[in-house]
Amino acid sequence: MTAAVSVAVVLGLTLGCGGGRTGHEGDGKSASGSAGGRAPEEAAGAVGPKKADEDGPTGRLRRAELEKTEVPGLVIEEAPPGTAGRGTPGSDQPACLPLANALGSEPDPKPLGSVVSTFAGAGEDDDLEGLLGTIRVSEYRPGEAAAVFRRLRDAAGACTGGFRMRTGEGESQVFDAVETVAAPKLGDEAAAFRLSNAVEEAPSLITVVRTGDVLSMFFATGLGDPERVQIPDRLVSAQVRKAVAVQRGGTGGDGDDAEGAGTEEG
């Protein structure tokens, strides 16, 4: 097994859940590299489906996506469609399956809508050097987000000794420890986990924040010093703030009121 498998688990699998952006405002490129920041079907004038999508859960969540340089020290990009693996992950331990599902491209249960972004360390911040990760923001049916959060937390507690998982494409990944670590004090509830890889030095990190029926999930690994791998609190705070603003009917912009979201700067 190589480090590429670990990176694929964090970066590749989570991109397959759909609903990724068609492009950042102002960068002039779409996911397919075309000019104008629009996907080909949008450029072709598919106004009806686009309007319906904008009014649905995924359309609302798109307004909560972070812009490219919105968080200092990080570059945030769209998650291009078609770059992730397919299929459902598995685990040798049923109790650990929620962790494998969280890392997979097909969340269980399927959310009403999702948007996915990638992030990477940038600039001169040594603590973020080599950092790679994804953000997945998903809206669920009433009660489902809380249930997913609970199952994930319970799985982490049951699988402290590690577990084996198989990606949807059949790649094997072995974790020799799962640790519940300090989580940012955000949203209705939050949790964070550190998964130690049995072969690679770089850990896989997961942070999840629930705000009502929306889960904001963050996945990260690193290509540098494994002891420095982190999911920056300022990234989590910024994303949760925008998700809360959109839930309250805002646009997700800086001017939207997110008071009461429990957000803290870190």
Please report, for each region that a protein language model flagged, where it lies by residue.
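A short acidic/glycine-rich loop-to-helix N-cap element
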Residues: 219-235
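Short, well-ordered beta-strand elements
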Residues: 133-136, 213-222
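Mobile, glycine-rich extracellular loop/lid and propeptide segments
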Residues: 205-208, 225
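A small/polar (G/S/T-enriched), proline-flanked helix-loop surface module common
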Residues: 76-202, 235, 255-259
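N-terminal low-complexity, Pro/Thr-rich disordered segments
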Residues: 4, 10-63, 91-95, 101-102, ...
